Design a protein with these regions (language model features):
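Residue-level recognition of the GNAT/N-acetyltransferase active site
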Residues: 20, 93, 126
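Acetyl-CoA-dependent GNAT
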Residues: 18-83, 88, 106-107, 112
Length: 135
């Protein structure tokens, strides 16, 4: 049996891809770190369908095959002087924090921002997430 405390080098296997509906059950569990009271599958599905095909939204997961390791949402907003990116719901699974998943997520966000000519990005985070703020 594999040692649960073993650090696994997943850097080569991590893929950043568009979020799929089938990812939502795993995300629902991960979102408990973001929203302690949880979020219903109905809300997740409704908001997924409202945003997934909109070009100004970047809904992505970091995955190893079908296993979701992390997720994020980026939204391009248009100000009068220039577009900018709002980054929300960044989450990395506790079992793979510190192994490059968050870095790959932010690299993908950077690419999306550049593609959309964003001048800057704003990261939204809840005040209680002190551990995540160290990242």
């Amino acid at each position: 049996m594999e040692n649960e405390n073993q650090v696994i080098d997943m850097k080569k296997e991590i893929q950043i891809r568009k979020m799929k509906k089938s990812d939502l059950p795993q995300l629902q569990e991960m979102y408990r770190d973001l929203i302690p009271e949880g979020v219903s599958m109905e809300v997740l599905e409704n908001n997924y369908y409202r945003t997934v095909d909109r070009p100004e939204y970047f809904l992505a997961v970091a995955a190893d095959g079908d296993k979701v390791l992390g997720s994020t949402m980026g939204i391009v907003c248009i100000a009068l002087d220039a577009p900018f990116l709002v980054v929300e719901n960044v989450i990395v699974s506790g079992e793979c924090r510190g192994q490059g998943v968050g870095r790959k997520i932010f690299e993908a966000l950077d690419e999306f921002a550049l593609k959309n000519q964003c001048e800057y990005a704003l990261l939204v985070s809840s005040g209680f997430r002190k551990g995540a703020h160290r990242f």
